[in-house]
C-alpha cells in the first residue's frame, strides 16, 4: 500500500525531500570565527624558509652551470682547447643555451656573487670567477690580434670594441665586482676599455645625457640607466675618482627629469626629444632596471655626495609607485598600470630584490614594505621549474609607442633576463629573513625587529 502511494505521488509531480538524520550545521557568523577560515591563495603565503630559498637557488645554479659551459673549442673541429697557450683565431666559447658575454649575463655574474655571500656556498662565486677569468684570458689573446678580435665573429668583440651601452655597462660593473671578489687583475684593462666607451664614445644629448639615435634621433631608453650608471658607480668606488660618481648621479637625475611621472611614481620606457607629447608606457622591466640602477648607485655613492639625497628620494618615490601595482598573486604586470597585460617574472624579481635590499639598507620601512617583498619572492619562486628554468620572462624588447607591442611580447625560458634577477631576489631575501622577525600575525605577514615579543601584538 505504501509503495502504491509513493508511486502515485511521484507520477503527479510531487517531490519528497529527504533529510539525513545527522544534519551538518551550516557555517555562520554565529557559530564560526570566519576570519580564521583558510584562504585559497594562488601562491604560497607567509614568510619563506631560508632552506627553501637555497633549494631554488641551487636548482637555478645547476641548470646554468650546465647551460653556460666555461670552455673553449676550435670553431672548425669543435675540439676542446684546454691549454690556453694554444688559442688560435678560430677559438670560440663552447656553445651553451646562454652567451657568456651579454648585458643579461653581467647581471647573472653579479647575482652569483651575491648568492655566494648570502648562502656561504662557494660554488656561486666560483661560477662567476671561472667564467670571468676565462673571458679575460680569451680577450688577452685576441687583443694581440686587434683586426681579428674586433671582427663580428670574434668571441670577445664586444669586450675589445664595445659599440653600444648594451655591450659595455652591465659587463663592466660585473667585472669590477669580480675584481673585488678575487678575479684576476688582467680584467682591469677591459674594465678601463668599457668605461672609456661609456664616458667618451657613447652618444649623448647636449646636456650630457646618454642617448641613442634609435629608433628615432635623440632618444632616451630607460634601460640605458642600467647599461651605464652601475658601471660608472662601481668605477668611482674602485678608483675613488668622483667624476664617475658625478656622471652617474647626473644620468639618474636627468633621465628622471624627462621620464619619471611623479604622480604615478613610475618611469616611461622611451623619451624622444622632438616629440611634443611623450607617450607614457610603463613597461615593467625597464622600471626594474631604473630601480636597480638607483639601488646599485646608492650602495657605493659616498654619504656626503651632494646628489645622494635626491637619488634616495627618487628611489623611495619609485618604490611607492611600484607598491601600488603589485597583483594579488605577487607578480607585477608587463605594463605596470594595465591589469589586462600579462604577469611578468623578471621585473617582479628585480622589484623584489630592490625592495628587500632597500629594507636591509635602512632606506625604506620594513613594516610597510617587507610583506610586499615576501609576496614577490613567493610568486617568483613558483616560476622556477624543476629543471631550474625561469618561466614567464619577457624576451628582449625594443621601444614602442602603442600598447599592443608590449602586450604581445613573447615569454620564453631562454630569455636570459630572468636568471640574474631571480638569483638576486633569493639572495637578498635570505638576508632579509636574518635581519627581521617575519611572522604571521592575525593571518597576515608582519615584520618586527629582531628580539621583539610580537605575541603581545596579537
Protein language model features and the residues they cover:
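Short, solvent-exposed loop/turn elements at beta->coil junctions and helix N-caps
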Residues: 215-216, 337-339
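Active-site mouth of glycoside hydrolases
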Residues: 45-48, 214-215, 277-278
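Bacterial Sec-dependent N-terminal signal peptides
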Residues: 1-23
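CBM-like carbohydrate-recognition segments
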Residues: 22-103, 118, 122-125, 130, ...
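Extended ligand-binding clefts on enzyme/binding-domain cores
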Residues: 222-334, 341-352, 364-398, 402, ...
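Extended ligand-binding groove/face enriched in aromatic
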Residues: 125-126, 136-270, 387
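Alpha-helical support elements that line or immediately flank enzyme active sites
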Residues: 112-115
